[in-house]
């Protein structure tokens, strides 16, 4: 797919225009209501449905240097956090436009880089006041050895904070049935054992939860403590204490740390719903996976006292297209595919315990472990492509079978590829071989069966063989998909491995469904790992916008920035330039946040046009500035479910409105990477472009408009 068409003025900053063009293609991915796109291969004309920035950039023509740079930034964010790429892409475009506007006004590049970098760092310090601590979200759930039979879990999904329809709560039902663990406890949203094992209460039964919701509302401001800034000694400000100050518009200083009341999240159900971001079905699966891992750990370790840490490496996905979405579920064990030729074998052996060996690497005659030094004096020559009785592979295959027969091995899990000839031989001798097994799967089966992974079959002895593995059909043998494969389930007693089976009637949606599931999983993972989240619904971006406008007004009104500690040792020219241009650059940076919030409101259909959204935002920004404390204003508005600032478009039934949360570090790092990309392109092109002043003087002739 080629880059979205956009007229690029060669007399202006080409790199920034290219960034803006790339970023505009992913605008619809922002917010809880994401519009999907079709990516069509120009050569084979195959199409795939995508709704993520990573998939989008994989399908774009990134032949230019700017495209490669943007893709590297997005890939770095995705490889590290798996979330935040849509925010990164959008802010790259918004801040590219902001930098372009600054260049049109004749602001020096060094000033733009300096002020924008320090402005973002100031925002990052300011939003610390909107962090919500997460404490003991699993403590309310009973971790005793009392167990119950896990029945079908009917998960009626809780509403998202911003339901764009506004006419009712978004509901969707899923059935989650764990066929492999009939002795796991289930818990209600309040943390007690549930008589009816449901991860979420049905909407029509939520009247019984009013007391819980009322407690959450009453505790909104009951906790008081001072949050310390993570950047207490920033190099960008001259501070001698650990306080976090920002300048108010009237010239006084506000100490954000003095905010006496903060939110707190102590319930896992509330946390999961707040991090769903509109994708309730995926979050229901993610939440069920975390609960299942927690329950499994509690059963294995009755006296377990250490805090629970969600091990994301023990969670896998298995995508099965062609089935209704109601078949999606999570359960203990390993779900994978085998060919139709294995159906008869599994039917014969599914009621018997399997003895298993684990192979690290390939199970082929030519495989050698990493670091193996092959002798230079041995040469192998094959006269025919067909295997003969005396060939090396045939001899090797026979030797492998002898080892398997000697130790009565009926299941072989291989991390790499497997010889097709060996697979056929094993099938004839009623032995199942499964290749391309994830390393974490091997480790999980090693722990559960006491098997010892080996590199070669020749290393196998009795101590390396595990036992107690059961193999069953995950779905009916008659439900064969288009690739002529059947899904099977491998389990063992006490195994710490969970598979989320994702189904969809449309094959084109499978990739999108898997991406959204992992996004929900990683939001939960980062939140539980950091033990803190941000207030969501645009609250953090709103505070950044208000904070920058306060700084800009303060700079404009006073003209003397010594109290802020901006570059005290800089040259007189730099100091004078900062004094003149700082308000403009800060407002341009704030414009990126303004555009961000406006795009979310338009995508969620809470406002019919960008003009109305921007007007709505600016009105509340002014209210926040006039209040003297934007952070307190935001916390106050969060306590008013009917305020319409961070709860626009929600249902009229306010008792059913949950809080919205967002991750901390992934969001902040997405901001940093977005600005780094923009400023890097700006500085790189500025070093190789000459005649910049002449170009800007003639911009009126080129564009018809001269920015003043």
UniProtKB/Swiss-Prot annotation:
The keyword ATP-binding does not apply. It comes from the Eukaryota. It is found in: Cell projection, Cilium. Keywords: Cell projection, Cilium. GO terms for molecular function: ATP binding. GO terms for cellular component: cilium. Pfam families: Cpn60_TCP1. Gene3D superfamilies: GroEL, GroEL-like equatorial domain, TCP-1-like chaperonin intermediate domain. SUPFAM superfamilies: GroEL apical domain-like (SSF52029), GroEL equatorial domain-like (SSF48592). One of its GO terms (biological process) is fat cell differentiation. InterPro entries: BBS12, Cpn60/GroEL/TCP-1, GroEL-like_apical_dom_sf, GROEL-like_equatorial_sf, TCP-1-like_intermed_sf. The keyword Protease does not apply. Its main location: other. Component of the chaperonin-containing T-complex (TRiC), a heterooligomeric complex of about 850 to 900 kDa that forms two stacked rings, 12 to 16 nm in diameter. Interacts with MKKS. PANTHER family: BARDET-BIEDL SYNDROME 12 PROTEIN (PTHR46883:SF1). Belongs to the TCP-1 chaperonin family. BBS12 subfamily. Component of the chaperonin-containing T-complex (TRiC), a molecular chaperone complex that assists the folding of proteins upon ATP hydrolysis. As part of the TRiC complex may play a role in the assembly of BBSome, a complex involved in ciliogenesis regulating transports vesicles to the cilia. Involved in adipogenic differentiation. This is Chaperonin-containing T-complex member BBS12. It comes from Mus musculus.
């Amino acid at each position: 797919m080629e880059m979205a068409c956009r007229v690029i003025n060669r007399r202006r900053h080409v790199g920034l225009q290219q960034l803006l063009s790339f970023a505009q293609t992913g605008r619809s991915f922002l917010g809880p209501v994401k519009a999907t796109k079709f990516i069509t291969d120009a050569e084979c004309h195959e199409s795939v449905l995508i709704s993520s920035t990573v998939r989008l950039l994989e399908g774009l023509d990134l032949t230019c240097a700017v495209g490669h740079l943007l893709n590297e930034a997005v890939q770095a964010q995705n490889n590290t956090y798996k979330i935040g790429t849509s925010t990164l892409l959008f802010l790259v475009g918004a801040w590219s436009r902001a930098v372009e506007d600054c260049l049109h006004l004749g602001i020096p590049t060094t000033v733009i880089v300096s002020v924008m970098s320090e402005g973002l760092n100031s925002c990052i310090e300011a939003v610390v006041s909107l962090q919500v601590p997460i404490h003991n979200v699993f403590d309310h759930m009973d971790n005793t050895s009392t167990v119950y039979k896990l029945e079908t879990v009917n998960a009626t999904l809780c509403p998202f904070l911003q339901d764009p329809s506004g006419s009712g709560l978004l509901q969707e039902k899923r059935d989650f049935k764990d066929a492999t663990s009939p002795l796991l406890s289930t818990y209600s949203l309040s943390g007690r054992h549930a008589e009816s094992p449901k991860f979420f209460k049905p909407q029509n039964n939520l009247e019984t939860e009013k007391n819980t919701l009322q407690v959450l509302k009453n505790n909104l401001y009951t906790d008081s403590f001072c949050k310390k800034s993570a950047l207490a000694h920033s190099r960008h400000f001259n501070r001698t204490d650990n306080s976090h100050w920002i300048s108010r518009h009237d010239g006084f200083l506000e100490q954000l740390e003095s905010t006496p009341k903060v939110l707190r999240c102590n319930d896992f159900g509330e946390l999961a719903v707040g991090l769903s971001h509109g994708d309730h079905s995926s979050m229901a699966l993610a939440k069920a996976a975390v609960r299942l891992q927690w329950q499994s750990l509690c059963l294995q370790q009755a006296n377990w006292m250490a805090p629970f840490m969600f091990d994301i490496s023990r969670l896998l996905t298995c995508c099965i297209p062609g089935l209704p979405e109601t078949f999606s579920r999570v359960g203990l064990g390993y779900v994978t595919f085998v060919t139709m030729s294995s159906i008869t074998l599994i039917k014969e052996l599914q009621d018997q315990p399997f003895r298993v060996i684990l192979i690290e690497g390939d199970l082929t005659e030519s495989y050698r472990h990493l670091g193996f030094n092959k002798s230079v004096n041995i040469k192998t020559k094959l006269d025919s492509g067909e295997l003969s009785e005396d060939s090396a592979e045939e001899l090797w295959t026979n030797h492998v079978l002898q080892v398997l027969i000697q130790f009565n091995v009926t299941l072989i899990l291989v991390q790499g590829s497997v010889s097709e000839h060996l697979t056929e031989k094993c099938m004839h001798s009623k032995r199942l071989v499964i290749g391309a097994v994830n390393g974490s799967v091997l480790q999980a089966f090693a722990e559960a069966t006491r098997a010892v992974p080996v590199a070669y079959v020749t290393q196998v002895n009795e101590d390396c063989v595990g036992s107690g593995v059961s193999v069953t059909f995950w779905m009916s043998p008659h439900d064969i998909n288009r690739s002529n494969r059947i899904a099977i389930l491998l389990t063992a007693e006490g195994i710490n491995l969970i598979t989320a089976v994702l189904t969809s009637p449309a094959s084109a949606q499978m990739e999108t469904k898997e991406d959204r599931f992992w996004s929900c999983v990683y939001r939960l993972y980062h939140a539980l790992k950091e033990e803190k989240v941000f207030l969501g619904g645009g609250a953090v971006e709103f505070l950044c916008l208000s904070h920058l406008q306060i700084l800009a007004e303060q700079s404009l009104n006073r003209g003397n920035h010594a109290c802020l500690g901006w570059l005290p040792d800089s040259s007189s020219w730099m100091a004078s330039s900062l004094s003149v241009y700082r308000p403009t650059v800060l407002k341009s940076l704030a414009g990126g946040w303004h555009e961000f919030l406006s795009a979310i409101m338009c995508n969620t259909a809470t406002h019919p046009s960008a003009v109305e959204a921007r007007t709505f935002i600016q009105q509340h920004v002014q209210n926040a500035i006039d209040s003297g404390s934007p952070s307190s204003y935001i916390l106050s508005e969060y306590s008013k479910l009917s305020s319409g600032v961070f709860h626009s478009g929600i249902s009229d039934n306010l008792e059913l409105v949950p809080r919205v949360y967002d991750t901390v570090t992934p969001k902040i790092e997405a901001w940093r990477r977005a600005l780094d990309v923009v400023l890097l392109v700006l500085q790189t092109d500025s070093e190789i472009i000459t005649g910049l002043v002449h170009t800007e003087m003639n911009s009126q002739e080129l564009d018809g408009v001269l920015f003043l």
